[in-house]
Amino acid sequence: MVRPSPLDPRKSPKQARSAATVEIILEAAARILESKGLPGYTTNAVAEKAGVSVGSLYQYFPGKDALTGALIRRETSVLMEEAEEAARDASGENALKRMIAAAVAHQLRRPALARILDFEEARWPDVQDIRRVKEKLMALLAEVLAMPDLPPQADREVAAADVLAMVRGMIDAAGEREEVERDDLERRVRRAVFGFLK
């Protein structure tokens, strides 16, 4: 029997009203993380901010970790949609530039939240859906690196993993420094990635 992850929700909303309640709870959690950080992030604080009872919160999320997992899934799904769209570009160079732009935008859209969720995600490296997202991103990158207008790589999977680590490392470091200048960060990441691929 597969044991549920501590990041799994208790139940999924079936009706539109329930889905709206879950979204309100998630947004309240995001705002608390942004304004109070992890020390102020409690289920009671989230319920109060969302305007729901703690019991209502616990209907969907058995605890803080499940709430955090749902936030990670929500934020990551936005990044994945943007990366998938970018990877469809006919030019490898443009696809890679657009993927970098999506990653930078993702970090800078809500930088405090992104920093905290990155930290929390690192606590759960073996959770299946987190691992699946990384694998999907690496597969997308490997496909882009195979495009004929980019320099050939001896091992595309290794190159994709290196590029992903480089992009994430630079963007996370910029987030830790609380950088907000999107164009400059994008330029630096592009320079590093394309320099590496030559």
What annotation goes with each model-predicted range?
Residues E84-A86, L117-W124:
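Short linear capping/connector segments at secondary-structure termini
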Residues S77-M80, K97-A101, A105-R109, W124-L150, ...:
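Amphipathic alpha-helical packing segments from all-alpha helical-bundle domains
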Residues E143-M147, L164-R182, F194-K198:
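Amphipathic C-terminal alpha-helical segment
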Residues M1-A20:
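N-terminal intrinsically disordered/low-complexity leader segments
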Residues A20, I24, A28, I32-A66:
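Helix-turn-helix
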Residues I25-L33, E75, L79, A103, ...:
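Short hydrophobic clusters on alpha-helical segments that form packing/core surfaces
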Residues T68-E75, L117, V133:
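Alpha-helical DNA-contacting segments of helix-turn-helix folds
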Residues L71-R98:
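Amphipathic alpha-helical linker/stalk segments
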